[in-house]
Amino acid sequence: MNEKTINEQYTYIRSLLEEKRLKEALMQLESLLWQCPDWDLRTRLEQLQTSYKYMLEYMRQGANDPERWNVYRKLVADTWEIADRSRLLMLDNASSRYYHEVRRTPRPESLSAYTLKKLLHMLESFNDDLAVSGLLSDEKMDEVLKRHEETLKYMFLQTWTNSAWTPEEEEDAQSMLTSELLPVNDLCLFISAVTLSLMECFDLRKIMWLLDAYRHPDVNAGQRALVGVIFIFHIYRNRLSLYNDLVKRVDLMDEIPPFKEDVARIYRQMLLCQETEKIDKKMREEIIPEMLKNVSSMRNMRFGFEENEDENDDKNPDWADAFEQSGLGDKLREMNELQLEGADVYMSTFAALKSYPFFREVQNWFYPFSKQQSDVIKQLKQEGNEKNTLLDLILQSGFFSNSDKYSLFFTIRQLPKAQQDMMLSQLGEQQVAELSEKSSAETMKKFNERPGTVSNQYLHDLYRFFKLSVRRHEFRDIFKEKLDLHHIPALSNVLYSEDILFPIADFYLKKERWNEAIEVYEEMETIGALQGRGAEYYQKLGYALQKNKKYAEAIDAYLKADTLKPDNIWNNRHLAICYRLNRNYQAALSYYKKVEEATPEDTNVIFHIGSCLAELGQYEEAANYFFKLDFIESNCIKAWRGIGWCSFISRKY
């Protein structure tokens, strides 16, 4: 059986389970297991079938069984788990994916004793080993670094490809969280491995562990774990309700003060990541070309740097005009606003810098930037450990993701020494000092340790992995999917409220994602989450409907807004537009007249009043409006056409 057939059969079984058609799912699973070499799974399936038959028999007899629903849920959950395991085992022999290649490759005898507990002890000793080796020789240090990274790789691959933890492995994983000697960067990599493992196969123990990891005192570990939880909840949204312990655990998490805020923020950041392709296109096609186009014209502009210090206040106001006239000012402001919003503005810059050997290893995409990484430490040693203030500031910046910091570091260090010096000396000593002062170590540290900064950086790392990795086609790309996290039953208590949904709907509106905006706004009306914002709400709903060309529905929304906030000019203008586009010219005319009272010289309003009058056959009055338009706006072709048409129809040649 080939990979495509296996996945098709599994998908069908999954759809049956989602539709609660357990009997058919069991029959299909039995057929699938005939191709599976694991007899334990067949035995488990036979036990499930027996339990299901007994449950049906008790129901036929009319027996009162208060635990029937719990038994049924367990049967469905167990059936799903058997289907998961059988799919993986069969794909191990059929798939060329790296995941299955690792699973089917026999583990060398020398590594067979390396349990998670053993690996933890090895990682805990790294800092001491590195300190001692630094006193001995470079060869010893290289040996320690190499051993550490080989240990991390082995830990990552074994965790990623482990489909289900045993109770002992779960206990060892808990030791990773409580260890005071384990480097936080190593723990972060382990958390990512657990997340990727769950993306391949559901495992309740791992999900519970990620929820525990969210409570870790280090913000990097905690936020990384929560991002993983949200990813997994999105993937397995239809299965979570089968596990009472998990549902209760999530309900209890809601009592942790920052949990709701963290989940809502990550939700918004994930949606923002989906805008990266648009931003990337805008950067490549608009912003960067505009900047390059204006370089030559700005290069010869005298900025007064040669003036005496006493005359520094004599700045030429024409400089600002030059920026604005070139359009460069608007582009730079737009870029700055995107960056402050948390958008990924560096994707286009770093997309071409992921070809270094470092990125050929899957685990390296998820390891936080560290100067103790072997490639980094070697490069720094070659430079004689010279402290580079500017480079340090760049690498410590919270605006770059971890993988981008590695790309930037390798790129700069690959340049000849002369070019490096030229690049890093572009800022004068005074400017570096100012930058250092503004980005003092303490300020930078606080910014980098903000939960929002950490989660955003990690999401950017994940986005790059799913979009740029050489193995990207082997992974499920969450960012391509519809992200409606508030529809996940396990998170409904956390996200289904006005203070969460209103910003989400506004985000969709701002990004011109009209269908999603309409969906969320309508849901808010259903749950009655307006609370004094009714007029604003109906205006925004109407606007989204209008942009989606649903004019009749938009009119209904605008009329509700008009009831709550009468005679609003913006609302009347859009009612007029929708009535006109819906060919109800009489109603459109009445609202255009209301807008005209407030803005009597608005040329667009005057033109559309004339157009509506013409459509209604009132050509003489329409012509008067077109003459008025011609008077206000000279050489107005629209006015001339209107006058000509009305004169022709009225036979006033």
What are these regions (language model features)?
Residues 34, 526, 559-563, 593-597, ...:
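Conserved structural position within tetratricopeptide repeats
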Residues 224, 499, 533-536, 569-570, ...:
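Start-of-helix register in tetratricopeptide repeats
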Residues 367-565:
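Alpha-solenoid helical-repeat scaffolds
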